[in-house]
Amino acid sequence: MILSLASLLLTQAAAAQTSPAQPAAPPSCTGPEHAALDFWVGDWDVYPNGKDNLVAHSKIEKLYNGCAIRENWMPLRGNGGGSLSGFDPATGRWHQTWIGSAPGVVGFEGGPADGKMVLTGWWAGSGPNGEDGLTRMTYSRVEGGAVRQHGEFSADHGVTWQPSFDFIYRPHDSAGD
């Protein structure tokens, strides 16, 4: 009896060792809250709204198991930069961190509103006269598969807003490369 019990225990121990534990799957970022900014993903030619003079190229990628969106902003003139955006399930908010080739880091926070993505953050020196204040960016789909990024500035903590930039992201024309 003791011999059969020992044999049974050894057999179970051996079976447990031959079946390696499967690593836990990473958390999924496939829900609709993680897809709220997916319309911005793509290779883009960027123009001032209402004009046809190309000012930048921008590559927007969905990365890290669908949990992040990375922007690479490549202006034809001036400083480039990029951002990393993602949804935080703990807060229910979207966050974007912008880092440019000029010193400084800007953090934005917000979320979807009326089919658009609205992100707001404190941006030192971003005012029309170089003053510090809030910048609110609104991303929206527009006709022709394009995306509008409309920026507004507030020097009074969001009481009033004035336009600061307005870009249209059109799908990149690879024929012109």
What is each stretch, according to the model?
Residues A16-D177:
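Hydrophobic small-molecule pocket/channel-lining residues, especially in calycin-type beta-barrels
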Residues M1-Q12:
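Bacterial N-terminal signal peptides
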